[in-house]
């Protein structure tokens, strides 16, 4: 469960290391975001020679949360950290590699590219 001011790790090779959620997209009163939701993020920490610089604002999709996600069979999938993948304005991933596992809930038409790049789908 991600809200404004939440810090997330970046799970791709764009050069950003840490981002902060500055807005949960999808309605004016929406407070929380989970796996598969799109948020606005500000880059807080970035690699020196990366594609992305500190202070820039991007869209991102959440791929891992410590809160987890409940499946229809009753199982709960949760992770150690919160992580996101940086997106451009067309909601396509900027990076060419994804690090760490992603969940099966991302298998929609919007995020199939992320699922295909991920090393493991849980």
UniProtKB/Swiss-Prot annotation:
Record PROSITE patterns: RIBOSOMAL_L14
Gene name for this UniProt entry: rplN
Gene3D superfamilies on file: Ribosomal protein L14 (2.40.150.20)
Family: Belongs to the universal ribosomal protein uL14 family.
GO CC terms in record: cytosolic large ribosomal subunit
Keyword Ribosomal protein in annotation: yes
Membrane-crossing segments per the record: none
Pfam families tied to this protein: Ribosomal_L14
Domain of life (superkingdom): Bacteria
Source organism per UniProt: Nitrosomonas europaea (strain ATCC 19718 / CIP 103999 / KCTC 2705 / NBRC 14298)
Protein name stated in the entry: Large ribosomal subunit protein uL14
């Amino acid at each position: 469960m991600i809200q404004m001011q939440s810090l997330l790790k970046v799970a791709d090779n764009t050069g950003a290391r840490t981002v902060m959620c500055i807005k949960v997209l999808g309605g004016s009163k929406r407070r929380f975001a989970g796996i598969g939701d799109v948020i606005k993020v500000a880059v807080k920490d970035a690699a020196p020679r990366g594609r992305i610089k500190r202070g820039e604002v991007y869209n991102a999709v959440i791929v891992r949360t410590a809160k987890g996600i409940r499946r229809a069979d009753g199982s709960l999938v949760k992770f150690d950290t919160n992580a996101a993948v940086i997106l451009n304005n067309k909601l396509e991933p900027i990076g060419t590699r994804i690090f760490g596992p992603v969940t099966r809930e991302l298998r929609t038409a919007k995020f199939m590219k992320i699922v295909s790049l991920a090393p493991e789908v849980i």
